[in-house]
């Protein structure tokens, strides 16, 4: 994407990304059985601190109860009823694997649905229901904090951020505004300035929230940013969300001046993010994308996933090819807002951020099989989570593994070695 992206959609290029990507195989580590693992984390903490990292934010949603594949929009379009599936063997079976009512992913207790609250009660509920599957648990964040900060004079602050999980354009745009407000809060609370860095690790569609935030951070995005902020302010006023209007009023002047972080730098790592929105790197420090990926293709294009029907319907139940949520939750898919006001505002945001709509366009985007966006570095990782089990709770179609406790050392090592220089 151009340096000044201005909310353009990613071009979803299938070209070889070359030196932008590396390939790794995971080595799980259980800290309770490995003092050397704790020592390694402490060394990584020193390297992070040396490079100015003062805050690490662990941003996530919930795989449960949120239409993680975004089939509501595809069903609303009625692709199967309108004959788009004629001649495409296995398409109805694929949609059944993606659909909430038939994919085996449980609902949240009490029918809890997005927007999810970023509060202790909801976080505890997720920890109880889904554990460390696509979820940065309190245990994970606390262990990260303790292990990184051993021996540091200035501790690195570790923060857990649960986004609303509204898997549509409006929800992600509102979450981007909230996140920018929080970034400002943290910059002030921890007295960050020139030379300091905030590192955000974003799982799944939380990465798309950060992609929108990167466009809002760009000093050059004036007209589109104003248009989007005005749209969101009007919607927030309509539904009595004064927190959104207040945040926009507070951050808009700072965004225009490039002063939101008070001179600090924002680094972003995405974990299993579907490729949709384009990134604007001009307001970021570093950008890295990590994807659970196993090479199944026969054409030598090792950097692409495999999306062949009907074969995918046999590969997906055991997560054979890696992360299928990352692969399939692309343009055209989405949850659907529940109110008329939400639907109208979502359509207006849609027109700014994503030119694709329609069942056939979704299928076209999915078949592009792109693992990485056009901006940033990438790591393709075989996380070894395909064991032959068809129990979705074991792998959640390859989307759960990034936040597992036994992956903390591996992920942190890869992130630090890729983004931050040795002392």
Regions from the language model: what does each represent?
Residues 43, 169-311:
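Serine-dependent carboxylesterase/thioesterase catalytic core
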Residues 59-75, 85-93, 112-117, 123-138, ...:
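Lipolytic serine-hydrolase domain surface
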Residues 1-47:
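Intrinsically disordered, low-structural-confidence terminal and linker regions
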Residues 56-196:
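Active-site catalytic motif of lipid deacylating hydrolases and related acyltransferases
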Residues 96-106, 201-205, 241-243, 309-318, ...:
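Noncatalytic linker/hinge segments flanking ATPase motor cores
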Residues 49-53:
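Proline/glycine-enriched tight loop/beta-turn segments at coil->beta junctions
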């Amino acid at each position: 994407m151009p340096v000044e992206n201005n909310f353009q959609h990613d071009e979803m290029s299938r070209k070889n990304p070359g030196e932008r990507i590396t390939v790794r195989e995971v080595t799980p580590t259980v800290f309770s059985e490995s003092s050397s693992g704790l020592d390694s984390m402490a060394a990584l903490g020193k390297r992070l601190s040396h490079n100015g990292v003062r805050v690490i934010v662990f941003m996530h949603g919930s795989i449960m109860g949120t239409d993680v594949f975004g089939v509501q929009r595809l069903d609303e379009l009625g692709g199967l009823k309108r004959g788009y599936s004629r001649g495409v063997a296995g398409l109805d079976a694929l949609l059944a694997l993606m659909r909430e009512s038939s994919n085996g992913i449980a609902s949240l207790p009490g029918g809890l649905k997005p927007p999810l609250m970023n509060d202790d009660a909801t976080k505890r509920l997720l920890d109880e229901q889904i554990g460390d599957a696509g979820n940065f648990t309190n245990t994970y964040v606390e262990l990260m904090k303790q292990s990184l900060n051993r021996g540091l004079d200035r501790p690195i602050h570790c923060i857990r951020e649960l986004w609303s999980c509204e898997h549509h354009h409006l929800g992600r745009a509102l979450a981007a505004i909230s996140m920018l407000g929080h970034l400002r809060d943290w910059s002030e609370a921890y007295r960050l300035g020139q030379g300091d860095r905030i590192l955000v690790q974003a799982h799944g569609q939380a990465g798309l929230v950060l992609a929108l935030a990167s466009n809002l951070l760009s000093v050059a995005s004036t007209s589109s940013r104003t248009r989007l902020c005005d749209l969101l302010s009007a919607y927030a006023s309509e539904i009595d969300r004064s927190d959104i209007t207040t945040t926009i009023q507070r951050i808009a002047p700072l965004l225009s001046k490039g002063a939101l972080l008070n001179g600090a730098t924002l680094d972003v790592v995405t974990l299993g993010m579907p490729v949709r929105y384009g990134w604007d790197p001009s307001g970021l420090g570093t950008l890295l994308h990590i994807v659970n990926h196993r090479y199944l293709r026969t054409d030598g294009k090792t950097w692409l996933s495999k999306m062949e029907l009907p074969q995918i319907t046999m590969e997906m139940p055991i997560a054979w090819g890696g992360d299928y949520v990352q692969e399939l939750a692309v343009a055209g898919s989405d949850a659907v807002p529940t109110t008329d006001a939400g639907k109208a505002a979502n359509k207006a945001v849609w027109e700014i951020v994503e030119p694709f709509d329609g069942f056939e366009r979704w299928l076209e985007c999915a078949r592009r099989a792109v693992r990485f966006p056009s901006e940033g570095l990438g790591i393709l990782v075989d996380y070894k989570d395909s064991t032959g089990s068809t129990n979705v709770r074991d792998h959640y179609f390859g989307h759960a593994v990034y936040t597992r406790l036994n992956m903390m050392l591996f992920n942190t090592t890869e992130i630090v070695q890729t983004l931050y220089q040795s002392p």
